Amino acid sequence: MEAEKRLFLKALKEKFEEDPKEKFTKFYTYGGWQQSARKQEFVSENEKIVAEKRGGIPMYNPDIGVPLGQRKLMPYKISNTDTYVEGDDLHFMNNAAIQQLWDDIRRTVIVGMDTAHMVLEKRLGVEVTPETINEYMHTINHSLPGGAAVVQEHMVEVHPSLAWDCYAKIFTGDDELADELDDRFVIDINKLFPEEQAEASKAAIGKKTYQVSRVPSLVGRVCDGGTISRWSAMQIGMSFITAYKLCAGEAAIADFSYAAKHADVIQMGNALLGRRARGPNELGGVRFGILSDVVQTTRVSDDPVEQSLEVVATGAALYDQIWLGSYMSGGVGFTQYATASYTDDILDDFSYYGYEYVEKKYGRCGTKATMDVVEDIASEVTLYALEQYDEYPALLEDHFGGSQRAAVAAAAAGISVCMATGNSNAGVNGWYLSQILHKEYHSRLGFYGYDLQDQCGASNSLAIRNDEASPLELRGPNYPNYAMNVGHQGEYAGIAQSAHSARGDAFATNALIKVAFADPSLVFDFSKPRKEIARGALREFEAAGERDPILPAKI
């Protein structure tokens, strides 16, 4: 790639205000932590908090510990945008968009409606029509936001301003039925997807009908992901009783409960082992293929690299920053690990280089998945990436950790292999090979054990035992060899997506989840995750689940 076309140069020049090729620089001349407007704000707010709310107990003090700002406290350009932000604003605690990104996934549950409709018609002799479905949808949208009274009288209810983000919608592969339902309640596959994707999704769904419940964000925060399906199920049962004028005590109601809680429920995340201390619909159980289908870039962009990189960014924010950044590192967070893959157009540059190489030599999805192909593409892309780190010291400082560089180079290698083969297993082997090549080049990658899972990855990828060899789409943060190390999981998700992007698939794993997250009523826009994260960093993103309506008024 010609030097002037390198995508990361603009960001490097803006960040460091130096020639990116300059090999000599300065230290301790930038003003320490005071060069950061955000840290100045932290200090100012801290003084008020200590005096007014903490009774003098000290809190934030940037002069404690290692001196901050020895070098440039660099801003970050959110990749594929023109937005520059401070690093602090990408910590998930400081970014409302990243919080809502997770809220919108955790608070979602999909429930099949056909079992309940069958019980109504065959067991109770009640006719189910588009009109009765509309009546039911009116009822569930009343009851779901806060257990609003529909069966019992004299019930306490939730303030609508606390649960404005809560609603239920319906979708089906049956165009005739969809046309007869109230538009306000329908996720319209034909309108939301390009024609070929719409037809593929409807074919996968068939004539079945599904409800998507969006439980209030506040419920997921106060309770947990395991609560979501139960909250949804209770209101589904009450709404069926009301809409179809049933007796709450009759035996058939148990069938509704079983269907809504178990038989017809699709969670976003599987339950984890007891020692992980998490239930269903928690991040550790969200598989890579599911996350690929949650992200919606395939509906709005024809660029397979962009589609893949949006999944990488989403996975980095969720798996690295929230899941591992809290579960493993307890608040210190892995923000810089994650941001390496979605800032400064660096992974974009490496990935587009690989894509151009693939298009010229093989064609998109133009060759079989063989180890010769994996070795060729992964080696080419990895060496290109390492050459950039050698040529541009500013790039090396931007990715100041070895495992940051390893993750970004390997992600580009894996994505590029998928672009040629349309095979996610080949892609993840491109990742593994990149890690090994990188280690040969630099002798080590990052912290001790960073590449442990990559050293055994190639042999496991074709193993028979399912705890080693699940398809990449069905692996996740709790997959045995993947459960320990940051700087991997978001990239794995992007590699899984890239195989399907190369093939032009309508979805990666589950058409139901792809359709459910095409819903324009969601608070977070899943078609442009990086843009949304940038809005969060700029404090332009309005999140749900806030408690202002029940807090004292501020004058």
From Swiss-Prot:
Question: What is the recorded name of this protein?
Answer: Methyl-coenzyme M reductase subunit alpha
Give, as one word, the top-level EC class: transferase
Record EC number: 2.8.4.1
Example GO biological process term? methanogenesis
Give UniProt keywords alphabetically: Cytoplasm, Metal-binding, Methanogenesis, Methylation, Nickel, Transferase
Give the protein's biological function.
Answer: Component of the methyl-coenzyme M reductase (MCR) I that catalyzes the reductive cleavage of methyl-coenzyme M (CoM-S-CH3 or 2-(methylthio)ethanesulfonate) using coenzyme B (CoB or 7-mercaptoheptanoylthreonine phosphate) as reductant which results in the production of methane and the mixed heterodisulfide of CoB and CoM (CoM-S-S-CoB). This is the final step in methanogenesis.
Organism the protein comes from: Methanococcus voltae
Record Gene3D superfamilies? 3.30.70.470, Methyl-coenzyme M reductase, alpha/beta subunit, C-terminal, Methyl-coenzyme M Reductase, Chain A, domain 1
Give the co-factor note: Binds 2 coenzyme F430 non-covalently per MCR complex. Coenzyme F430 is a yellow nickel porphinoid. Methyl-coenzyme-M reductase is activated when the enzyme-bound coenzyme F430 is reduced to the Ni(I) oxidation state.
Necessary cofactors: coenzyme F430
Q: Which cysteine residues pair off into disulfide bonds?
A: none
Superkingdom, natural source: Archaea
**Residues reported in the UniProt entry to bind coenzyme M:** Y337, Y448
Record: residues binding coenzyme F430 = Q152
Which gene holds the coding sequence for this protein?
mcrA
- UniProt pathway annotation: One-carbon metabolism; methyl-coenzyme M reduction; methane from methyl-coenzyme M: step 1/1
